[in-house]
Regions:
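Extracellular jelly-roll beta-sandwich "head" domains, especially the C-terminal globular C1q domain
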Residues: 22-143
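Fibrous stalk/shaft segments of extracellular and virion attachment machinery
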Residues: 1-30, 34
Length: 143
């Protein structure tokens, strides 16, 4: 059983495999932001997408995310987007040394709890992120 939902710019695919159900609820995703380096602090990340869902504790899950474009703010600057499952980073998209990345997709595996939160965090030195096509997917959960 595959159900599709789209809220704002956040597309969610929920797949039920071998009776391991994952039910999803979503929040909105921001379409873009500019992140500026803070003196004495460094660069900070911003949550750009959030997905919450219930699962069976101990199950493994495959999660994917994509970011349309990440632009570092200069030739010596870096930008990152992190995939975070229940406060642990499980995947990264990186744009380094001033080179932008476009259409990057990362899939990563993690372990579920009963109630799960997946986030995409992005940030960097004067980073601009175009997130209009950002997607966050729960591909499957399995025992």
């Amino acid at each position: 059983v595959i159900t599709n939902a789209k809220i704002g710019n956040l597309a969610v695919d929920t797949i039920k495999i071998a009776n391991r159900a994952v039910t999803s609820q979503t929040s909105t995703v921001v379409s873009s932001f500019r992140n500026t380096y803070v003196n004495g602090v460094g660069w900070v990340t911003q949550t750009v997408a959030t997905l919450t869902f219930t699962g069976v504790a101990g199950d493994q899950v495959i999660i994917g995310f994509s970011v349309k474009q990440l632009y570092p703010g200069g030739s010596d600057r870096d930008a990152y987007a992190y995939l975070v499952l229940n406060n642990s980073v499980i995947g990264t998209i990186a744009a380094r040394d001033g080179s932008y990345v476009s259409g990057s997709i990362v899939r990563a595996a993690g372990t579920l709890t009963g109630s799960n939160t997946v986030k995409v965090l992005a940030g960097g030195d004067n980073t601009y992120a175009d997130l209009t096509d950002t997607s966050l997917f729960v591909f499957e959960a399995f025992k």
